[in-house]
Amino acid sequence: MYKRQLATLGLSYKEGLDAAARGSAGDSMRAVLRRFYGPDCDTDAIMDALHAQAETAFQAPPPKKPGLDELIAYLEAQHIPMVVASSSRMASILRHLNNWHMTDHFQALISGEQFTSSKPDPEIFLTAAKALGTTPAETLVLEDSYNGVRAGARGGFVTVMVPDLAPADDEMRRLYTAECKDLREVKKMLEEGKLLSET
């Protein structure tokens, strides 16, 4: 996805950019872009181009993650509140949740647009925990991006990686609490009391 939009700005894709940028926004994304394209690159133009491409690519709702419905049903049955804390724009979050008829399941929706620093800064997750009325140590973070896992670990959260586009590497294995192949496995671990003691 990045190659086409970068080309419109006269830039070539640099290996590793997608993994480094995934899950970031705002100043965190700008820092990634400067690392790859130099301190004087037009970060706002690059980000605008990438956001425009993402908005076009994701007009149709992506498929739900396997096990999502079962996990939400389990959490609701256990009276465990949920928050969406995503680096995506709020318009994208709402579009996906509305298309899936899932908006009402969540106590709060938190977008990366609300913060100057995004993942790997844990601020977005700390804000989510505040909305839930929980401490990081009793709050489960589910993440598929490296930056998200970094943010969860830095904030002291129970961080579970559910890999999607990028597999867990040695750094992720040092940082996360657990790795699950899908959300069904997350549910199983919760049922077995392996993630949150309250469950």
Regions found by a protein language model. Name each.
Residues 16-24, 41, 45, 59-66, ...:
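Residues at secondary-structure transition points
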Residues 1-69, 73-78:
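N-terminal helical cap/lid subdomain that shapes the substrate entry/recognition surface
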